[in-house]
């Protein structure tokens, strides 16, 4: 066998054997050690081919090329006569990747980072990359204050040159901030400055934002907060000189020292605007007016820049540049602000596109647009389209993106990116509700029927006290101008006694149709007609019912029927930021009806609902919600409003913590009534001449309900589901009264039901979930102000409705 000459042993250890300037001609190339890599693939990666004349430099280039493929741990090139013998050791293939001990970082996030570094199942393992990954993960833990954390990559060999890769984490504990010192502050105390930080050395129990756990990113944010605090108060020369973060020997404590130079306070002497103002100098000048002697304020300067950009954006200048340069005069402690504006090009909208609307048709989204294709771009019109899409309630999120058209200097496309949510459900089953007992439900409710935007409902319910069925349809764009048309037909068999109301049975059916007329972006008027037939039976005489029957001329009736035609009207103001789980804005809804000639009854009824959401943070995760509900009705022409049209309160949609419909006036049964008027629910005759007091609610013709709610982020819920779950703490209050009540007509121990001051109150916590079955609402409330006859119900839940 001819002697083999070693040309190069490996990447790190090489011996350069010189074959002369002319080298030798390669007659053949052989490989040893290939397992996963094909011979053809290896040959293609080499710069040397059979028949080439090679020298030392060619051999070095060959080795580098083979290493560059990432498939080999070791490469040796040997010469056997005119044959090149390439000996390789392939890198092992990753068979599996597992993690152990990682609590702060999820597996999915780790896998994404590994894949970004080329480490994935089925790929070759580069051991040098593992060292970088270990160090990068440890640096991450250090940045969040876990200085004792360690990450080790454990590689376990398997047959056929495969390995298992396991990352073992020892996270340790987060270092806590022992003290934060600010050096150089004279105008403000250290306590005042630190009170605006997220990081704290002391955290009161009530502070849900402050944190003693050190995090590098939070410190950077706090330093920016400190800078803004001074700049907003005129300290134009303020500077953070240095920041020291010291670690205790046991790596469990942190000391932070921030060295600052406050400088003096400066006042604005004027604002000078220059540049390409695109003919809008007068409007821009209004945005830059300042009060004489006003302190320099960095936040106001930034807002002024943003306002100028928004102004130009409304006129089609999609990418304006606004830069403010303060000229500081140290002699008189003033700042002159020079604002340079470059409006840039004005843009047309070529196309409006929608992404993510797999169910909703483009036409449903497009009719909500206020920005038109082929027109000048208007940023305010684009934003209005986003608001209108959010208010539809079809989408979890709506985002906009203005994209330049390649090759065009003055055209853009506006893209609305939506994430659809479940807008309805098909259900058939048996359920249980705290207010309805065992119930059987079947139906379809779809707010975006087949993606057309139609709202269609086919529903049926049967429970302890009610059999109800309804078909409803609403076309929100009956005309191209946005006039809506809705209608429904229904049937209801209602056993009032089983619903904790006074004794009667009402079988009713009816229909109504309503037109909605948009007045502007936020206001809609509604008008319509309705018909309802009510057939009452099993009426046990009680005072409120008796008043109504007397006004109808049939005081002794135990059965009664009425056909009524109504004119229905309403007004809605809606400026909520989205249709479900809103976080900002207000909504006011006024509804009413009045009987028209041809009706057996003569009455009117009005109700008003309001809701206002006020976010208290920039991310709208913490929100204060205030709600009210008012109702009033009365008879006309000497008749009373029917008792079955009364208002009720109590339950998950009004005052939580009280049983449904139990707040307010109670039935006082007349002598001879056969009912469960006493507390043990045994049916017997009322024998008291003045009447028998009961706990059966009868409602009233007037109602007032209010609620104050604090919406918070839901614990243990990932960002993916944050828009589907809502947690809140609430305080509810409400009352129902009867303005026509005559205390002299009832026993002396019966309260005055005409008094609106009998207010009930409760407080508790609520959880709402937009589930695939529809909205699920859970609440736990404790009544802390109630009256005799009220029925408490701390835990309540409902399917399919929110307030």
UniProtKB/Swiss-Prot annotation:
Lineage: superkingdom: Bacteria
A biological process term (GO) from this entry: protein insertion into membrane
InterPro entries noted in UniProt: Bac_surfAg_D15, BamA/TamA_POTRA, D15-like, OM_assembly_BamA, POTRA
Pfam families on file: Omp85 (PF01103), POTRA (PF07244)
Subcellular location: Cell outer membrane
A Gene Ontology term for the protein's cellular component: Bam protein complex
NCBIfam families: OM_YaeT, PRK11067.1
Subunit comment: Part of the Bam complex, which is composed of the outer membrane protein BamA, and four lipoproteins BamB, BamC, BamD and BamE.
PANTHER family for the chain: OUTER MEMBRANE PROTEIN ASSEMBLY FACTOR BAMA, SORTING AND ASSEMBLY MACHINERY SAMM50 PROTEIN FAMILY MEMBER
Name the record gives this protein: Outer membrane protein assembly factor BamA
Species, as recorded: Salmonella typhi
Phylogenetic lineage: Bacteria, Pseudomonadati, Pseudomonadota, Gammaproteobacteria, Enterobacterales
Gene: bamA
């Amino acid at each position: 066998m001819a002697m083999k000459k070693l040309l190069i042993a490996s990447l790190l250890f090489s011996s350069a054997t010189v074959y002369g300037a002319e080298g030798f001609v390669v007659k053949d190339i052989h490989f040893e050690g290939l397992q996963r890599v094909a011979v053809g693939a290896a040959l293609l990666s080499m710069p040397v081919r059979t028949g080439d004349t090679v020298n030392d430099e060619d051999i070095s280039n060959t080795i580098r090329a083979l290493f560059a493929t990432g498939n080999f741990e070791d490469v040796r090139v040997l010469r056997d006569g005119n044959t090149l013998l390439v000996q390789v050791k392939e890198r092992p293939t990753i068979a599996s990747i597992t993690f152990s001990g990682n609590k702060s970082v999820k597996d999915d996030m780790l896998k994404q980072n590994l894949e970004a570094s080329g480490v994935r199942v089925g790929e070759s393992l580069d051991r040098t990359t593992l060292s970088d990954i270990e160090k990068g993960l440890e640096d991450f833990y250090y940045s969040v204050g876990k200085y004792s954390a360690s990450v080790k990559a454990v590689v376990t060999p398997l047959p056929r040159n495969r390995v298992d890769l396991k990352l073992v984490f020892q996270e340790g504990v987060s270092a806590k901030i022992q003290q934060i010192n600010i050096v150089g502050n004279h105008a403000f105390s250290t306590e005042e400055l630190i009170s605006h930080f997220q990081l704290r050395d002391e955290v009161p129990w009530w502070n849900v934002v402050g944190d003693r756990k050190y995090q590098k990113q939070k410190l950077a944010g706090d330093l920016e907060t400190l800078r803004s605090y001074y700049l907003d108060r005129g300290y134009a020369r303020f500077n953070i000189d240095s920041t020291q973060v010291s670690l205790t020997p046991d790596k469990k404590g942190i000391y932070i020292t921030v060295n600052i130079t406050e400088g003096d306070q400066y006042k604005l002497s004027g604002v000078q605007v220059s540049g390409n103002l695109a003919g809008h100098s007068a409007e821009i000048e209004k945005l830059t007016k300042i009060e004489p002697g006003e302190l320099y304020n960095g936040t106001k300067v930034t807002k002024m820049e943003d306002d100028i950009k928004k102004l130009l954006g409304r006129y089609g200048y999609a990418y304006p540049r606004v830069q403010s340069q303060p000229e500081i005069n140290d002699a008189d402690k003033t700042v002159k602000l020079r604002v340079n504006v470059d409006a840039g090009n004005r843009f047309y909208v070529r196309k409006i596109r929608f992404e993510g609307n797999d169910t909703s048709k483009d036409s449903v989204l497009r009719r909500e647009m206020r920005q038109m294709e082929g027109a000048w771009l208007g940023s305010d019109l684009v934003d209005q389209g986003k608001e209108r899409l959010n208010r539809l309630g079809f989408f979890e999120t709506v985002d906009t993106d203005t994209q330049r058209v390649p090759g065009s200097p003055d055209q853009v496309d506006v893209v609305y990116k939506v994430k659809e949510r479940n807008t309805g459900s098909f259900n058939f089953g048996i359920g249980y509700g705290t207010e309805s007992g065992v119930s059987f439900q079947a139906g379809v409710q779809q707010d975006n029927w087949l993606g057309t935007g139609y709202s269609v409902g086919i529903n049926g319910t049967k429970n302890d006290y009610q059999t109800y069925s309804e078909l409803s349809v609403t076309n929100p764009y009956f005309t191209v101008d946005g006039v809506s048309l809705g209608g429904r037909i229904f049937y209801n068999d209602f056993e009032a006694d089983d619903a904790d109301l006074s004794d009667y049975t009402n079988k009713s059916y009816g229909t109504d149709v309503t037109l909605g007329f948009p007045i502007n972006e936020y206001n809609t008027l509604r008008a319509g007609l309705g018909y309802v037939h009510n057939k009452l039976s099993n009426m046990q005489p009680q005072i409120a019912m008796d008043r109504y029957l007397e006004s109808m001329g049939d005081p002794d009736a135990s059965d009664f029927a009425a056909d009524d035609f109504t004119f229905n009207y309403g007004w809605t103001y809606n400026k909520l930021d989205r249709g479900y789980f809103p976080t900002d804005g207000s909504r006011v809804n006024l509804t009413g009806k009045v009987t028209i000639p041809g009706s057996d009854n003569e009455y009117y009824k009005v109700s008003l609902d309001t809701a206002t959401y006020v976010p208290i943070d920039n991310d709208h995760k913490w929100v204060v919600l205030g709600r009210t509900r008012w109702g009033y009705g009365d008879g006309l022409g000497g008749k009373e409003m029917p008792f079955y049209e009364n208002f009720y309160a109590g339950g998950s949609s009004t005052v939580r913590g009280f049983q449904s419909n139990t707040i307010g006036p109670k039935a006082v049964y007349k002598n001879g009534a056969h009912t469960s008027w006493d507390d043990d629910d045994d049916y017997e005759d009322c024998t008291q001449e003045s009447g028998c007091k009961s706990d059966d609610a009868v409602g009233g013709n007037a109602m007032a309900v209010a609620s104050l709610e604090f919406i918070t982020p839901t614990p243990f819920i990932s960002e993916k589901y944050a828009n589907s779950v809502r947690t809140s703490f609430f305080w509810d209050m409400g009352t129902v009264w009867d303005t026509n009540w005559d205390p002299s007509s009832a026993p002396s121990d019966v309260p005055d039901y005409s008094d609106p001051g009998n207010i009930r109150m409760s407080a508790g916590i609520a959880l709402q979930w937009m589930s695939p079955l529809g909205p699920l609402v859970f609440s736990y409330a404790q009544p802390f102000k109630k009256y005799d006859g009220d029925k408490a119900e701390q835990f309540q839940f409902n399917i399919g409705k929110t307030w």
